[in-house]
């Protein structure tokens, strides 16, 4: 058996990126969270192509096609669920986000309230 990189190589790259991710601040984290629905949708779209090819061209048992369909449905559900992340992030961190977007006097002055400066 040869190959195996079709699914594995991109997943390994995603894992590498996740383990080396060092956001500069929480606004970046929020912005990155906002891209998760699209990323998961693209992943589901790729699975749909695989599912369609398996169904139309590959000599696999129909049960395999069914399993791929179930996997695709779960991926679609994950993309849908990820759409809840940004509104939740904004709601649950409203006070922090308001302060970042509307600092008192200036960003430099607001930084004096930074927890790390007051421990």
Which role fits each region the language model picked out?
Residues 2-119:
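Eukaryotic extended alpha-helical scaffolding/oligomerization regions
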């Amino acid at each position: 058996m040869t190959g195996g990189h079709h699914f594995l190589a991109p997943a390994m790259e995603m894992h590498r990126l996740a383990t080396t991710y060092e956001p500069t601040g929480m606004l970046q984290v929020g912005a990155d969270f906002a891209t998760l629905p699209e990323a998961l949708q693209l992943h589901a779209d790729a699975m749909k192509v695989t599912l369609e090819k398996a169904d139309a061209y590959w000599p696999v048992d129909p049960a395999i096609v069914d399993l791929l369909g179930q996997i695709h449905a779960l991926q679609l559900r994950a993309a849908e669920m990820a759409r809840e992340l940004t509104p939740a992030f904004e709601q649950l961190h409203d006070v922090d986000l308001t302060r970042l977007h509307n600092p008192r006097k200036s960003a430099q002055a607001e930084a004096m309230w930074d927890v790390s400066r007051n421990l």
